[in-house]
Amino acid sequence: TMRDLFDVVGLLNGDFPFVHENGSEHSYLETIQKAKNLAGFLAKKGIKPGDSVGICMQNCTEWIIAYLGIAAHGATCVPLNSWLRGDELRYGVEHSELKLLFVDEKRYQYTQDLDVLQVIKTNSTTDALTFDDVFKTESANWPEENATDEDVSVLLYTSGSTGLPKGVMLTHLSVVNAILGFYTLGELRGLVKGETLLAVDNAKTLLNIPLFHVTGLITIFLLSTLAKRQIVIMNKWDASDALNMIQNMKITNISGVPTQSWDLLNHPKVDDFDLSSLIDIGAGGA
């Protein structure tokens, strides 16, 4: 299960710089401890393995912690497209039968009337629960109950380009296999072609894809746990910001869609940046 993976990563890799967002850093074990607190919070709220718990936020540290806690608790994580509004968002919440929703303040204006318990990232306007309330739930270990490897770990929604979005069910085993597959591919390229893609000191990847997308979730975020790689969060895509972050944070890996690669290559000042830290650039999709 995902919980097993998170624990094995801690045993194999120990502690390492894991999440960086706007100058704030969290180590892997620190992040996992916050995830354990969040899992304990879910248990106190009556969330059981197999229940659906949603996340509707822009990329942020709390998004990562929420996913780790939900997955390790054995609940089904439902990453909702944070660009949705109105009826589209209501459809996702109702169709997935959410028991609880983690949301940021910007999205809360569209979700506050929905019939689901909500936790807000920051909260200056209401009496709703916040992440501060979540992290006050101290849990030294994961809750006793857990999922099985064939239970649904994450429910990702399609874009709905030909109709209503469809929920794609990924089991714990399928997600773990995907992570191990990507990691093994990187190792094999090192053995066969002499290319170093993952096993480098101070590896850092730019999180420039929304976490509600499979690329951001699995090939950037979750692969980084096994690869002992720091995730440098972009809250919103901007080519100038990306070039600055690659240079200043010494990013080693970046993935994305072809339009992002085009943005970087055709930036009017791309030659002014030191991008020598990059060892791997990937792009796919539309």
Regions found by a protein language model. Give the residues of each.
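Conserved AMP-binding/adenylate-forming core of the ANL superfamily
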Residues: 2, 17-60, 64-68, 85-90
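ANL superfamily adenylate-forming
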Residues: 107-149, 164, 176, 267-268
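Structural core segment of the AMP-binding/adenylate-forming
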Residues: 44-45, 72-133
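Adenylate-forming
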Residues: 58, 103-110, 209, 237-238, ...
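Conserved AMP-binding A3 loop
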Residues: 27-29, 153-181
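A short helix-loop-beta submotif of the ANL/AMP-binding
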Residues: 52, 58-78, 82-86, 94-100, ...
